[in-house]
Amino acid sequence: RRGFVPLWQERLFGPDVDGRPDPRPDYYRYLPSFYTNRILQLSEGIESSDLGTYNDLALRSMREWITDPSKSQMDYDNMFRMNYNRNKSGASGIYMIEERHTDQRDFNFAANIAHTFRNQSVLRGGLTARINRTEYYDQVKDLLGADYWLDVDKFALRDNGNYNPLLSQNDLDYYLKHGEARRVGEGDKFSYDYYANLRQAQVWAQYYASFGGFTMSLGGEVGYTAMWRDGRLRKGLFANNSLGKSKTLDYLTYKLKGEFSYRFSGAHAIDANVAYMVNPPQFRDAFVSARTRNTTTPGLDSEKVLGVDLSYNLNLPWITARVSGYYTSVADQSKVISYYDDTQSSFTNFAMSGIDKRYYGLEVGVVVPIWGGISFNGALSLGDYRYTSDANFTQTRDNSEEVLRGDKVLWDDLYVESTPQTALNLGLSYRGPRNWFASVDFNYYDRIYLSMNPARRTRAAYATVLRPDEAAQLPGAVKYTALMNL
């Protein structure tokens, strides 16, 4: 099987890095939180008049967002006007719409075989293979009236000025050949262009047997994964580490799994499952900044997963129920988060490794027939999902090889985010003749934790947190806290 899957994302391009206003209404400098954050950052030694100024700016920003539509909408007329004015002098446009592409080519192969023995046990086996090449690139979608777009790294241009124009080139080879930065038009690739290459192969086997009320299934898999980045452009900031192939990351993986079931009678049965897996890291987490260079994530390792669960099944004419307990541990995960860090005035990459998690809990499900095709159904899930270690991290600038900092993310024993750890479902369902079906359900979810910003969980971040006695000394501290909550 082969496939070609193009994906893209349109985005307005024109960041505020060279003194021109950012056109996005939700740009962080236009929001009330920008001014309240400044109050907190400058809390020590700030004059009371400055506190009042920032407070007034925050209130004005909030009022404008609520009452002035021009503050919450894109001003395309102004963007076209500014681009047209640039055309008169032959200069590059300053606003345009980009289209970020993810074009995937995927080839898959699978073969399997099975043999049934005289005792009706079954042995199955097979192999799978995959070749994937995904191209990531940026493309000019709409110039918004401009004649062309200059393909340079504006952040590098801001940081390095004009003393070394080589550093700001997104396509250094073009600059060295023609003596000027590349001019791109609508439909042209720009900014970044690279291939993510993946090769995978697995061999697996599974044995199934049944003896009286006991059944079991034992399985295993051994696999190999290789991945590498292939840059299509030589970036000026990383002239020796952006064009061409990166080193190949190789991983030997395996999986072991056992499923066991014993049926005491038609009404009572227990199931048990155990699995241990070693998985390769994801490509997106294997490189510090795949858009710009071949540098791999420090401390990158295979992910280890151990899972066990035990269930009791009840099946009677007047009730069907299942009670399950489970435990899962995950070790050595990696993750890369890219974001604009206003404390560094730069787009940064926050690469983490050694992320460990633990999940355990209890699940109960029940169905009770009531009358004439109407039945009651309910389900309850109670879990406890936490981080079990302090992950390692390295933070780098997107436009520099310099490591800004490296330490631990202090989230040991904190809750895993984004999934409910308490869930309840209650409902009534009706099954009528001719497959007619209707249901009414009530769902309740609790203990859903927001995703944590790991940059706020470092030793350096904790060192800047005010103690209660320090916060009490701030002029109007309660007032500004209330403002932040608004």
Roles of regions detected by a PLM:
Residues 119, 327-329, 348-455:
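Gram-negative outer-membrane beta-barrel transporters
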Residues 171-183, 226-237, 248, 262-308, ...:
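Surface-exposed extracellular loop regions of Gram-negative outer-membrane beta-barrel proteins
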Residues 3-18, 140-150, 155, 232-243, ...:
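Flexible, surface-exposed loop regions and adjacent strand-edge segments
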Residues 93-96, 100, 122-265, 392:
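Signature of Gram-negative outer-membrane beta-barrel scaffolds
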Residues 1, 123-127, 216-220, 256, ...:
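Transmembrane beta-strands of outer-membrane beta-barrel proteins
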Residues 1-6, 92-136, 186-215, 249, ...:
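Outer-membrane beta-barrel transmembrane strands
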Residues 1-132, 320-322:
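Outer-membrane beta-barrel domain signature, strongest for Gram-negative TonB-dependent receptors
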Residues 2, 129-135, 211-213, 222-228, ...:
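Transmembrane beta-strands of outer-membrane beta-barrel pores
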